[in-house]
């Protein structure tokens, strides 16, 4: 699947580690995008603005369903609940919802080992990475531990 097919306006929702990673990924792809966060205060707003010139930044009261419905795609960070009324209204209006892992799997052309479950994921992930490195393999470990998926080497 082409991550850009039919998408003209993107919004990165949630500006923690994963959201900023998604924004950097959009930059590397040459995509136009804006940024928003549900928090009423963003202590690093100036840093975000200067790092993503050409993108608009919305947060606090500016975060609304009307804002989100203006976009073709929302790249929603895992820390932002999809059950939020604003996001649910955007979904109802036909806005595509995706996340960093979806974008990663659409664009990654390297072998991937995905580890899921309730308990022990970080430990198993770390051990698998170390075993593969010990076997002489080129390995990048990331996702919800350490490096966000979209910041992993290509």
Segments from the language model and where they lie:
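Phosphate-binding loop of NTP-binding sites
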Residues: 27-28, 65-69, 78-154
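N-terminal leader/targeting and accessory segments in enzymes
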Residues: 1-99, 103
